[in-house]
């Protein structure tokens, strides 16, 4: 366990003074339930805190980076940047899923790659860094792993808009999103959506909401569509 923690800290470029905070950030509720650990020890409280820290820092970034942009557009941009699919994308770049502490059920059903799980863990990690190292270190982490390479990330977090513009510009076709699977209890649903251009299937996505699943399906559709044109 210690080697894994060290490896993750090397990846993110931050060394925890209190590694218990890092462990808590990686601990999913399925793990605490299975191991009979008190519920408050899982990463949900840190996720709550990290969400607030992320919103403040991303708001500050957008405020100064877009000095003439009106409030409504800034709000839309922030919502896109910190939505579940976007944060899951950032978590995948770090490989965060492989370090999570999951219960056996969550593990066997693909929890390490589930957007809802990895995006929540990323926010929990932000909360843990904030508590351990303060605002400046949390800001540095967000700058390096969430606000970095925004041009390429825009392809992901605004995929539906980009795909529609690409398709209309060439074929005048509409993109159709089809819900093909809905599973799980009401408090933890998972949706699977397919993206079609004309009659052809171009992408599939899974998310905790239909919108998140559509965004991921659109992202994969863009990659396939661009590949077909090359």
Predicted segments with their positions:
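Double-stranded RNA-binding/processing signature
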Residues: 1-230
């Amino acid at each position: 366990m210690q080697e894994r923690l060290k490896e993750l800290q090397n990846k993110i470029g931050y060394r925890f003074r209190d590694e218990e905070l890092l462990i808590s950030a990686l601990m999913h509720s399925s793990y605490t339930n299975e191991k009979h650990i008190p519920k408050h020890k899982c990463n949900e409280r840190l996720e709550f805190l990290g969400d607030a820290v992320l919103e403040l820092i991303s708001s500050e970034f957008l405020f100064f980076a877009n000095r003439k942009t009106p409030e409504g557009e800034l709000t839309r941009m922030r919502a896109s940047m910190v939505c579940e699919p976007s944060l899951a994308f950032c978590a995948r770049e770090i490989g965060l899923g492989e370090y999570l502490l999951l219960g056996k059920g969550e593990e066997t059903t693909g929890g390490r790659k589930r957007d809802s799980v990895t995006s929540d863990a990323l926010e929990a990690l932000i909360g843990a860094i904030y508590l351990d190292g303060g605002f400046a270190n949390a800001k540095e982490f967000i700058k390096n792993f969430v606000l970095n390479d925004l041009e390429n990330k825009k392809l992901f977090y605004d995929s539906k808009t980009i795909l529609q513009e690409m398709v209309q510009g060439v074929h005048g076709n509409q993109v159709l999103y089809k819900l093909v699977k809905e599973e799980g209890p009401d408090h933890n649903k998972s949706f699977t959506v397919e993206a079609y251009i004309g009659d052809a299937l171009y992408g599939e996505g899974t998310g905790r909401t239909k919108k998140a699943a559509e965004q991921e399906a659109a992202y994969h559709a863009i990659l396939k569509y661009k590949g077909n044109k090359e």
